């Protein structure tokens, strides 16, 4: 790896970093636990040369997002809000209705909320692929599996 060292600080060039693919199976796992593990990998915090202002993380594939689990009564009581930007345009959905309509949405919303706001966060979010079932179109990638708690 090509890097510039200045005393003890390591500056890694983003084009020298090899991005790997990580697969997380979300079946029967708690939503927040899976989301935090995915964000750690997307940001690159699992690597020794983590830099907060660069995209040094790996790509993440999450399968079985429709089988994700929640604790407590959140399945029927957790409310997701969105606004249409028109007067009186506040809309709300419970976890149940949102996951029936789009099974990957709750996990994507949780991960997007944990990423930095701004251009870097949008770039990191593009490195995430979430699938409702176990079938995915990225079979040609060499990925390593991660067991989330």
UniProtKB/Swiss-Prot annotation:
Superkingdom as given in the UniProt entry: Bacteria
GO cellular component: cytosolic large ribosomal subunit
Keyword hit for Cell membrane: no
Short name of one Pfam family: Ribosomal_L13
Single GO biological process annotation from the record: translation
GO MF, one example: structural constituent of ribosome
Annotated keywords: Ribonucleoprotein, Ribosomal protein
SUPFAM superfamilies for this protein: Ribosomal protein L13
PROSITE patterns for this protein: RIBOSOMAL_L13
Record keyword ATP-binding present: no
Quaternary structure, from the entry: Part of the 50S ribosomal subunit.
Family: Belongs to the universal ribosomal protein uL13 family.
Function: This protein is one of the early assembly proteins of the 50S ribosomal subunit, although it is not seen to bind rRNA by itself. It is important during the early stages of 50S assembly.
Alphabetized HAMAP family for the sequence: Ribosomal_uL13
Name of the protein in question: Large ribosomal subunit protein uL13
Organism per entry: Borrelia turicatae (strain 91E135)
